[in-house]
């Protein structure tokens, strides 16, 4: 079992239940899913860019990414409907907890000039969004094997109803927020 799942059951759940005065354990917010998205606008010109990004994302997430396609044609961006423009992975259950643990304890300390993540990136419903500028912070990515530095968006979806509940949940996992 993932260690963060054990931490959630033994430490985070009782702490949140006491802090927010929940009557039942099922009311305590929990993680639903983590979505990792790589938007690749330049993939329309070269298919190898998309393949390399998929390979990187598969190494990071431990799961095969799905290709995202353009919903509408946009002349300004020089894309047509149905063209591949990125890739994403949705993590749930054990893989989600394992990724979050690696992200919190291994990857985020490797970010240059890291002082913590902004607590303002909650969406009003307890979900947290953050962007990463380079995939090199993950130990699975070898610096010599990448063709270019790519960023990604990470969305942490929770069952929390408010931002305060969502922040308390992520802090319970040891998520590094700026003070």
Curated annotation (Swiss-Prot):
It comes from the Bacteria. Keywords: Ribonucleoprotein, Ribosomal protein, RNA-binding, rRNA-binding, tRNA-binding. Pfam families: Ribosomal_L5 (PF00281), Ribosomal_L5_C (PF00673). GO terms for molecular function: rRNA binding; structural constituent of ribosome; tRNA binding. GO terms for cellular component: ribonucleoprotein complex; ribosome. InterPro entries: Ribosomal_uL5 (IPR002132), Ribosomal_uL5_bac-type (IPR020930), Ribosomal_uL5_C (IPR031309), Ribosomal_uL5_CS (IPR020929), Ribosomal_uL5_dom_sf (IPR022803), Ribosomal_uL5_N (IPR031310). GO terms for biological process: translation. Belongs to the universal ribosomal protein uL5 family. PANTHER family: 60S RIBOSOMAL PROTEIN L11-RELATED. This is one of the proteins that bind and probably mediate the attachment of the 5S RNA into the large ribosomal subunit, where it forms part of the central protuberance. In the 70S ribosome it contacts protein S13 of the 30S subunit (bridge B1b), connecting the 2 subunits; this bridge is implicated in subunit movement. Contacts the P site tRNA; the 5S rRNA and some of its associated proteins might help stabilize positioning of ribosome-bound tRNAs. HAMAP family: Ribosomal_uL5_B. Part of the 50S ribosomal subunit; part of the 5S rRNA/L5/L18/L25 subcomplex. Contacts the 5S rRNA and the P site tRNA. Forms a bridge to the 30S subunit in the 70S ribosome. This is Large ribosomal subunit protein uL5. It comes from Halorhodospira halophila (strain DSM 244 / SL1) (Ectothiorhodospira halophila (strain DSM 244 / SL1)). The gene is rplE.
């Amino acid at each position: 079992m993932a260690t963060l799942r054990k931490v959630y059951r033994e430490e985070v759940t009782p702490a949140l239940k006491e802090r927010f005065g929940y009557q039942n354990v099922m009311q305590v917010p929990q993680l639903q899913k983590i979505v990792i998205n790589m938007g690749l606008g330049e993939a329309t010109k070269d298919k190898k860019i998309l393949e390399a990004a998929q390979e990187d994302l598969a190494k990071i997430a431990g799961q095969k990414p799905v290709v995202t396609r353009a919903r509408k044609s946009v002349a300004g961006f020089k894309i047509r409907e149905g063209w591949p423009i990125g890739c994403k992975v949705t993590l749930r259950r054990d893989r989600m907890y394992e990724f979050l643990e690696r992200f919190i304890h291994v990857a985020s300390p490797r970010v240059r000039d890291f002082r913590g993540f902004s607590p303002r990136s909650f969406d009003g419903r307890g979900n947290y969004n953050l962007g990463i500028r380079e995939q090199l912070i993950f130990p699975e990515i070898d610096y010599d094997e990448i063709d270019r530095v790519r960023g990604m968006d990470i969305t942490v979806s929770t069952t929390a109803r408010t931002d305060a509940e969502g922040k308390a949940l992520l802090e319970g996992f040891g998520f590094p927020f700026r003070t």
